[in-house]
Design a protein with these regions (language model features):
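Iron-sulfur cluster-binding cysteine motifs and their immediate structural context
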Residues: 2-45, 49-65
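Iron-sulfur-associated redox domains of electron-transfer enzymes in respiratory
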Residues: 55, 60-272
């Protein structure tokens, strides 16, 4: 009757194609001679789609959670050095059961010295990219490491047009280290590709570790921290335009605002 094929979440009744293979839009995952899924690292952009779509947990990204715990413990309550948490703007949509200020307080309870918004780095990047766009006329963003990797691997002819600016994560981390010689920076966001970005030569001096929101929740759970019971901490450094980077079209809006503030009224922004 076909009812089983309709309800099987893995399409196992009518197809042997793995969920991870279906999830990979750039076709970096194929079946090897043993019918096992294999990832072509020359094509993979580390977007994490396969990780989230695999129902069996067979694919995992590298975790730095133990490195972060070790970093905090060895800081001696931030006496030897200061451990900063840089949080992505999308954190407000991840911890929907609590207020952002409560998450900030929770981060302090975990042992972080201070919490900074990646959105503040986004403000800096939007300002710089708006200038660069007007100068060059055509530009692709350097904010998303997965997108940058995709251009480099699939469209190498566009590589010269990638913005020369660091991402918001790296930009705010560099700012923190320029103003605090003892700073160690941990980025916390939704994207597994950020872990690969943190390991890049041009980013490594600024970002010491990167974690996902799921790993942050694991840290809260391990310390039995109920963030809904905490007071709200303050976090108000970034602008509206820096915070909307996380939504579709947010980067274009922020760059458009930067162009406007710099007085380039003659320049017409055509975002695609």
């Amino acid at each position: 009757c076909g009812q089983c094929s309709k309800v099987c979440p893995y399409t196992a009744i009518i197809s042997r194609k793995r969920p991870c293979e279906n999830a990979c839009k750039i076709k970096a995952i194929t079946m090897n001679e043993n019918k096992a899924a294999a990832i072509d690292n020359n094509t993979c952009i580390s977007c994490g789609a396969c990780v989230y779509q695999c129902p069996f947990g067979a694919i995992t990204d590298k975790s730095y959670i133990l490195n972060v715990i070790d970093m905090i413990k060895k800081s001696g309550d931030n006496e030897k050095y200061h451990v900063y948490a840089v949080i992505a703007p999308s954190i407000s949509s991840q911890f929907t059961y609590a207020k952002l200020g409560q998450v900030v307080t929770g981060l302090h309870r975990l042992g972080f010295y201070s919490v900074a918004e990646a959105a503040l780095g986004a403000d800096m990047v939007a300002d710089a990219e708006s200038r660069e766009l007007v100068e060059k006329g055509f530009l692709t963003s350097s904010c998303c490491p997965g997108f940058v990797s995709y251009i480099e691997k699939a469209f190498p002819e566009l590589k010269p047009y990638i913005s020369h600016n660091l991402s918001p994560m790296a930009t705010i981390a560099r700012y923190l280290k320029e103003h605090d010689a003892t700073a160690k920076v941990v980025f916390i966001g939704p994207c597994t590709a950020k872990k690969g970005e943190a390991a890049k030569q041009e980013v490594r001096p600024y970002v010491d570790a990167a974690m996902t929101f799921e790993e942050l929740q694991a840290l809260f759970d391990s310390r039995e921290i109920d963030i809904t019971a905490l007071e709200e901490g303050m976090l108000d450094e970034a602008s509206y335009f820096g915070r909307i980077f996380a939504r579709c079209g947010g980067l274009a809006e922020a760059v458009a605002q930067g162009i406007k503030e710099h007085g380039h009224t003659h320049f017409e922004l055509k975002a695609t």
